[in-house]
Amino acid sequence: MVRYISDYDLQDVDTEVFKCITDESNRQNSQLQLIASENFVSKAVLQAQGSIFTNKYAEGYPGKRYYCGCHFADIIENIAIERLCKLFGCKFANVQPHSGSQANQGVFAALLKPGDTVIGMSLDCGGHLTHGSAPSISGKWFNAVQYQVDRDTGMIDMDAIEKLALSHNPSLIIAGSSSYPRTIDFKRFREIADKVGAYLLADIAHYAGLVAAGEFPSPIEYAHVITSTTHKTLRGPRGAVIMTNHEDIYKKIQSSIFPGMQGGPLMHVIAARAVAFGEALKPEFKDYAKQIIKNSKTLVKVFQERGLNVVTGGTDSHMVVVDLRPKSVTGKDAVLALERLGIICNKNAIPFDPEKPFVTSGLRFGSAAETSRGLQEPEFEKIGHMVCDVIDSLKTTDDVRLSIEQDVIRRVKELTDTFKV
């Protein structure tokens, strides 16, 4: 009998790919991960995502598939939906979107017509590409109007947003961001939306784990529809979800995702999401979320003590954004220097940034991944000082900079050797 599938392990079948995966594992273990949109998933999540469900095509929804053999696919998707609804206190949910961008596009397809007016946060002030940015479909297919933050405080100006809404009469208002570290007044957003007859979309991609744990305001009472990724503070596999308490909106979203935006769902990823949602329902996840915020506030404290300008003056979440202009350093130069020494973050635009997007005047840090690893305030205090040492070294002599870099490499290794992924 001839079989055309292999029973051999990856390391025996494809040494090139196996080496790349091994190298990436070593990189994650040996560096400090401070990118706000990344996290470390559990072994159980990895096992579910690498499961036999990767073989199954399950086009459609539970109980209404286009293919046979979907009994267990239905069970696993229903588990994911039930756990998600319990986690966020919502009535309806779609767990099939492949990404946060597709989740947002699915909402647009469900609720808007091309040319409708959409109000969202501008990219440089902390918004996401899908919130109406010009290069995105959201900026090309719709009349996108962007709100900004207050120039002096860096905070969302709700009065300015209300004036914008009254002036432009949008069909949809988006509350949410990708680099705004403060709480969001979802109640006020809904009041503004009601004044102009608009839908309110809350994009909580960055804050979802904190919302689920009660450490960040929940939009469930106010938003018509909520989107989120599942791989940031929620600590699940990559992908996204859509939630609502409105059955009429739910039905529109179901058809906009399938067959509107996607074909077959990724059942192995949905299985992994179900595991992650189950983990987030456990009491210890609340402790994890609390520690995330303690750690980010520790970074803020150190940065401010060392003379870094923290955008908005602080944080209420996992994110910290710093303005490097007072240091006469660009985000690009700083992030490359940090990466060389094993500290991974991202260059980031600051509000009204004069620099180009691939240069930027700022950095964005996130505490979720290293909190998953077990680091707490004492370790984040050390990280904060290392970051400041590296930034300050960029304006010193070569000899001084080399000495600082060697010291930071040693201190990074001490932390990563102690706290394994």
UniProtKB/Swiss-Prot annotation:
It is found in: Cytoplasm. The modification N6-(pyridoxal phosphate)lysine is found at residue 232. Pathway: One-carbon metabolism; tetrahydrofolate interconversion; Amino-acid biosynthesis; glycine biosynthesis; glycine from L-serine: step 1/1. The keyword Nucleus does not apply. Pfam families: SHMT. Keywords: Amino-acid biosynthesis, Cytoplasm, One-carbon metabolism, Pyridoxal phosphate, Transferase. It is an enzyme of class 2 (transferase). The record marks 231 as: Plays an important role in substrate specificity. It catalyses: (6R)-5,10-methylene-5,6,7,8-tetrahydrofolate + glycine + H2O = (6S)-5,6,7,8-tetrahydrofolate + L-serine. (6S)-5,6,7,8-tetrahydrofolate binds at residues 123, 127-129. GO terms for molecular function: glycine hydroxymethyltransferase activity; pyridoxal phosphate binding. The keyword Cytoplasm applies. InterPro entries: PyrdxlP-dep_Trfase, PyrdxlP-dep_Trfase_major, PyrdxlP-dep_Trfase_small, Ser_HO-MeTrfase, Ser_HO-MeTrfase-like, Ser_HO-MeTrfase_PLP_BS, SHMT-like_dom. Catalyzes the reversible interconversion of serine and glycine with tetrahydrofolate (THF) serving as the one-carbon carrier. This reaction serves as the major source of one-carbon groups required for the biosynthesis of purines, thymidylate, methionine, and other important biomolecules. Also exhibits THF-independent aldolase activity toward beta-hydroxyamino acids, producing glycine and aldehydes, via a retro-aldol mechanism. Belongs to the SHMT family. This is Serine hydroxymethyltransferase. The lineage of its organism: Bacteria, Pseudomonadati, Pseudomonadota, Alphaproteobacteria, Rickettsiales.
